[in-house]
UniProtKB/Swiss-Prot annotation:
Molecular-function GO term, any one: magnesium ion binding
Binding site for Mg(2+): 173, 193
Name of the protein in question: GTPase Obg
Domain Obg: 1-159
Cofactors, names only: Mg(2+)
Keyword Plastid carried by entry: no
């Protein structure tokens, strides 16, 4: 399935039905009173979050959504039927913005939330409402209300507890496959991961969701590579696991590239707690591990965790630390 996280769609509520002009007709009664019924109310447009969805692909090709209009009123004081409301399902984490603006209309953070964005138009009044002492046979009625219409932008920000960040080939996809049941595409070339992947980690009778986004490169926050398109998906995370390729010739430069891109993208990411891991230590000597760990400690001022997704060295410790950070 295609991963689509940005769409623009047109939505319109159903118009109200028109009121009816009608007069009572019965045998032996020549001039019955007005009995025109009211028009039915138009249907509303409602968004609903659905945990079974993880992409906005349903709105990629169909982009116009209109609720049913109410039926016109009828004689014998019969009101028209109300139009059926239209419910549009979206993934949890979807945000709705007014067209071409930063005005947030709604943010879905839980399953089965609903948001009525457009109400259907009110039905018009039948002529029975306009009978007076001086006008016993009114031919007046009102038309149904025209419902609101608008274009909206849907933006999906995946909900996860932990975000994986690092340069391409830092080992993020392998890490995700080791700690969860997720099956991301894994290969030894940059940008194997082209879309975000989610995995659920189970440990000590608890669980949390971890997100792997495409690798960052220098200039990602300005649109280079793939990373800037998907950085928003880790803005909601509690903690970031920053993987650094231990086989790199300059681990400090690699760390600084990712740190700079996170800081440039948003304050949300800049202030996230990070667990910094020196990955792929299975290809390093003990001396190289010690040297690169020390280099990173000096530049970050934080503890560095040597790990290997190939031998599973240090993985459990990282997962437990991530869980504890989430709970704190």
């Amino acid at each position: 399935m295609n991963f689509i996280d940005e769409v623009k769609i047109y939505i319109k509520g159903g118009n109200g039905g028109n009121g009816c002009v009608s007069f009572h007709r019965e045998k032996f009664i020549d001039r019955g009173g007005p009995d025109g019924g009211d028009g039915g109310r138009g249907g509303s447009i409602i968004f609903r979050s659905n945990h079974h969805l993880n992409t906005l692909v349903n709105y990629r090709y169909k982009q116009h959504f209109i609720a049913d209009s109410g039926e016109n009123g009828k004689g014998s004081n019969k009101s028209g039927k109300s139009g059926k409301s239209l419910t549009l399902d979206v993934p949890i984490g979807t945000q709705i913005f007014a067209e071409d603006s930063d005005i947030l209309l709604h943010d879905f953070t839980e399953d089965d939330q609903t948001f009525e964005i457009i109400k259907g138009g009110n039905g018009g009044l039948g002529n029975s409402h306009f009978k007076t002492s001086v006008n016993q046979a009114p031919r007046r009625r009102t038309e149904g209300e025209i419902a609101e219409e608008m274009w909206v932008q849907l933006s999906l920000k995946l909900l996860s507890d932990v975000g994986l960040v690092g340069l391409p080939n830092a080992g993020k996809s392998t890490f995700l496959s080791v700690v969860s049941a997720a099956k991301p595409k894994i290969a030894d070339y940059p940008f194997t991961t082209l879309v975000p992947n989610l995995g659920v980690v189970y440990i000590d009778d608890e669980e949390f969701v971890i997100a792997d986004i495409p690798g960052l490169i220098e200039g990602a926050s300005q649109g280079h590579g793939l990373g800037d398109k998907f950085l928003k998906h880790i803005e909601r995370c509690n903690v970031l696991i920053h993987l650094i390729d231990g086989s790199s010739e300059d681990v400090v430069a690699d760390y600084n590239i990712v740190r700079t891109e996170l800081e440039s993208y948003s304050d949300y990411l800049k202030d996230k707690t990070q667990i910094i891991c020196l990955n792929k230590i299975d290809v390093l000597t003990d001396e190289e591990i010690a040297e690169k760990t020390t280099q990173l400690q000096k530049i970050t001022g934080k503890e560095i965790f040597p790990i290997s997704t190939y031998t599973n060295t240090g993985i459990t410790k990282i997962i437990k630390l991530a869980l504890q950070t989430i709970k704190d």
